[in-house]
Amino acid sequence: MEKLTSLLLVAALLMLTQTLIQGGGEDRPNKKFLQKIKSTAKRECTAPSGYCDYPEECCEVECGRHYCDWWY
């Protein structure tokens, strides 16, 4: 009986460990996404038709050919 209890305890521990490992991998992209939203909210951004070097500089539009525009 003690062996069965020990076996069940080990099995439960292994399942818990596997769940925690798999669950942790899924949370990371969400954290990065939310962190990006937070960082863009704190800083100034370039309005449409404004000059840009990187896509992150534009407000709600894309940076194409060094200008923030809806069509890129």
UniProtKB/Swiss-Prot annotation:
Keywords: Cleavage on pair of basic residues, Disulfide bond, Knottin, Neurotoxin, Secreted, Signal, Toxin. Disulfide bonds join 45-59, 52-63, 58-68. Residues 1-23 form the signal peptide. Residues 24-41 form a propeptide. InterPro entries: Conotoxin. Belongs to the conotoxin O2 superfamily. This is Conotoxin LiC53. The lineage of its organism: Eukaryota, Metazoa, Spiralia, Lophotrochozoa, Mollusca.
